[in-house]
Every structure is written in C-alpha cells, then in structure tokens.
C-alpha cells in the first residue's frame, strides 16, 4: 500500500542470472524465509525480489550469505529502505 511502511527492514533486489535459469533461481529464492516475493522481469534484469527481515544484520546476511551465493546468479543490484 502506498504510504504504509512495514516496521521490518526491507530490501529490493534486481538479479541478473544465466540465460534460461530464471525459473530455477526463483525456485531457490522462494526457499529463503526472508524472500517476500520473487518475480520474473522482461528487459534489463531477470528477477525482482523483495526481502523482509527482523534486523538489518539478518538482511545483510541473507543477501550476501545466501542469495548472492546461489548458482546461476551473475549480478545483483540491491536497495535497502530506511526509516525517515
């Protein structure tokens, strides 16, 4: 919802993956508890992911320790939402 802010730390990731592996990567992403959603994209990136976590540290560990280490991921762009 517009204007409504979750109290959990959130991040949005754009993921580039090896050709033809987007379904496999999405399947693996959905196994990670912090992944709120993962959708295929058309054009500049392959997948968009929303992450929610209990803490910023847990969010960082999920991004660096789990998602970026998945097979077939070539690159990521991550933005983390901050409180005002």
Question: Model regions: which residues?
Answer:
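A compositional/biophysical signature of low hydrophobicity enriched in polar/charged and small residues
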Residues: 1-84
């Amino acid at each position: 919802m517009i204007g409504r802010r979750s109290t959990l730390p959130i991040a949005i990731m754009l993921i580039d993956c090896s050709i033809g592996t987007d379904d496999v990567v999405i399947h693996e992403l959905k196994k990670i508890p912090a992944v709120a959603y993962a959708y295929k994209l058309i054009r500049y990136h392959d997948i968009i992911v929303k992450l929610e976590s209990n803490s910023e540290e847990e969010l960082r560990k999920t991004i660096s320790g789990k998602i970026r280490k998945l097979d077939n991921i070539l690159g990521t762009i991550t933005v983390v939402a901050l409180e005002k």
